[in-house]
Every structure is written in C-alpha cells, then in structure tokens.
C-alpha cells in the first residue's frame, strides 16, 4: 500500500463521507436545528447551542485520562472575529470550542485552518473572559467538517473529488443530517471565510512567536513558517525544515500518519512547540502529543505573504557539505514545480508494491527520495555515451569509436531508502537521457569525457557528492517497461 493510502486510511474508514451522490442518510424524523452566531449565543440559557464556525486554530486530539479524549479549537464567524468589535484593537478575536469523547476517532482532526465546523448540542460558558463552547460527543453532541476550498486537505493529496460542496468531508458518528435550510447558511459562511482570510492575517501577531525569539520562550509557543523541505527520516517520520519571516531555520519531526498533508513550499501554523535545549548541531522544535501542524486555506493573505517572502538560500546545507561527515541530511536536488504536489512514494512502494497497489499501477510518474550507494559505470568517463538514433545503440567514446552520434548520459544509481533499509537489496534508478528525460540533472552538457577534462572533473565532484553520507536525492521518476527513469530533476549544489 502506498504512503498516501496509509496516511488517509484512518480518516476514510472511521469518518468516510456517504454515498457518491453525497446525500446524507435520513433520520426517521427530521430535526430542524436553530443555528446561532457565536457572539449572540446566550450565556444564561441552559439550552443546547447549534452553530457553524470557521476554524482558525486546533490542537490534535489527545488523551487526558483513561476514559477521556479532548480536542480544543478556536472558531470565528461574522459576529466574532476582531477584538476591535469590542473596541480593543485589531488582533483576532474568537470563541473556543472544546470537544470531549471516549474514543480518539470520535474527535475531529484539523489539517487546515479556514475550514468550517458545524456543531450540534454544545453548551456555552464564559472562561477567562472568552466564550467557550463545550461539546460532549460521548453524550449527544455531534460535529461535521466542511471544506472552504473545493477540496479538503486530504482530498488534495489523495486526488479524490468531493461528493458536493454541501457534503462534509468528515463527521462524528455513523451518519449526519443536513437540512435544505442549511445550504444557504453554509454557502454564506464559506464565502465570508474566503473574504476574511483574504482581508486579514487571521493568525495575528499575538498568536505566534517569531523563530528568532523561540529560544527565549519558557513553555509552549506557536509558529507560522514555510516548509522548505520534507525529508523522510524513516518509514514513519518526516523531518521538516522550517523558516519564518525572522529568517531563522528550524527543524522538527512530524509523524507521517499524524500529518500526511504536509508538502514542501507550504506555509503552516504549528500549535504548541517547545525549543529543544539539547540540540547542538541544529535548531529544533519539539512537538507534544497534542501539538498540531495545519496548513492554510488557499485564500490566506498571511500564507501568501510568508510563501513569497521566505526563500531558501541553502546556507545550512552548504555548510554541512563542507564537513567531512555531515550530521544533517542534505537533499541535493529539486524537482520541477509542476510536480510539487506529487506525494512521495517509497522504494518499497515502487519496486515491491507496484503490481498489487492499484494507485501505483495506474500511474507512471512518481516522486521518491533515496540515497545512492554506488554509481555505475564506476569510471566517470563512461557516463556519457554516443547514441546512434538510427540503430538506437549507445557506444563508448573510448578510443577511436563513437563517430557522429549524439552525446547522452547513461548512468545507473544503486539506491536505498528508509523503507528498504533493513533488506539486502539495492535498487536501480536510471539516468538515460536519449529521450530527454533527466537531461538537466547534472547541469552539465553531455560531452566526450575522455577529452573534456572540465566536464569530467565536475561530474567526478557530483559523484562524490551523491555518494556522500547523509546526501539524498529527491527525484521525479517515470516508469517505462518496469524500469524507473529520472526526469524533471536537477542537482542544486
């Protein structure tokens, strides 16, 4: 099974949307709910409250004791979103929503802020001057999540199409209700959410800590940063390279099963991180069991600003490559932007599961990460061949042969990754450029390396770099006749 499928399996099994037409299952007797605005819900009434809200922050569901799981969210709507509405400045205002359940799977997992939650039968109280809604899912409360963008975060990475814009992508219980009268309410709050994220930062400056001040923090703090790199540390864990507008670079570990939606280039909000005092080689953020990493809806003004202003100068990697032994993983390559959204597949997926996994067998282009144990031919001068397009045969430049042909690279990489770490196999990934695939991988034009000493020396340097400890390749590969060929990938060092 592919990593993309593994990551979404829990959500799809436990909270799968209904039949393809998106029609909810009908209860025997329809219940018409009266929805209230967050700031207009009565603090004195003992009656249960029903509401729609836009999520702007959330913990990951976590266990508090033997019988209780909890998830805490910040929600807004047109009645409650700016403190200036109370005459106290332009920072974001919100209500909190605390959901309780006896099972982890009965609570919502928020992957993206800006999406919409509908809650039935919550109670309301004032806690530290803030409106706090409490929903006991183990009693009679319920929730449903609706995407503000066309697709939910998991639908984006999984390639699924939503049933309809009135269908929740996740919900509590076995089914949900949806009255016709709710359609306009949902569409209106969705439209408002888009405008709200376009006009305001939403995550105002008082709601996160710049990374250059992280070391001074005594406890948990929140972060808004751009993911510069997603590195597969092992079969279960990704290491994220993060940078924010303060210019600081940090790293953090993110479990694949917990955070399957994260991609390089995206802007994220990290809820509840701490500074790692023990790390001396690089700056690290530690996450707790309740920490969350969420992306932003596409309309987000703040995300667009951070994405545009934060760039990767690769200074950390350049310094690491100068060391005899690099203690930090260095990804030597980048893939073409058109493949930025491709999920990463392991070598186990590509070489062992391709025939049995329907998702993999139906495609021919994949993204993968690996390290190189050996490059063949061992003699760098033989990396370039003369290719005769009439006979479709390559020949060596050695000696007096190879006249009139086209110079191409023919290189084989013997590779491994985290998923194949414990087996005795190595796997061949090919750089054969006669059809144009991978032509720019080396940033060196193929030439007769028996004569062109400058090109040969450059490629010898690349050979050393590619096989150096802790050096990795992030590549797009195309499957042809059972072989994987590198394409749309280039070395950036």
From Swiss-Prot:
Record-given protein name: Telomere-binding protein subunit alpha
Keyword Nucleotide-binding: no
A GO cellular-component term linked to this record: nuclear telomere cap complex
Compartment list: Nucleus; Chromosome, Telomere
Annotated segments matching region Disordered: 1-30
Keyword Acetylation among UniProt keywords: no
PANTHER family assigned: PROTECTION OF TELOMERES 1 (PTHR14513), PROTECTION OF TELOMERES PROTEIN 1 (PTHR14513:SF0)
InterPro entries: NA-bd_OB-fold, POT1, TEBP-like_OB2, Telomer_end-bd_POT1/Cdc13, Telomere-bd_alpha
Function: May function as protective capping of the single-stranded telomeric overhang. May also participate in telomere length regulation during DNA replication.
MF (Gene Ontology): G-rich strand telomeric DNA binding; telomerase inhibitor activity
Annotated source species: Stylonychia mytilus (Ciliate)
Record-annotated membrane-spanning stretches: none
UniProt record, GO biological process: regulation of telomere maintenance via telomerase; telomere capping
Entry keywords, A to Z: Chromosome, DNA-binding, Nucleus, Telomere
Gene3D superfamilies, per the entry: Nucleic acid-binding proteins
Pfam families for the chain: POT1, TEBP_OB2-like
Annotated Basic residues bias: 7-17
Additional remark text: The sequence of STY56V is shown. STY56I differs in only one position.
Description of how the protein assembles with itself and partners: Heterodimer of an alpha and a beta subunit.
Principal place of residence: nucleus
SMART domains, per the entry: Telo_bind
Entries under SUPFAM superfamilies matching the protein: Nucleic acid-binding proteins (SSF50249)
Gene label: STY56V
Superkingdom of origin: Eukaryota
Similarity comment: Belongs to the telombin family.
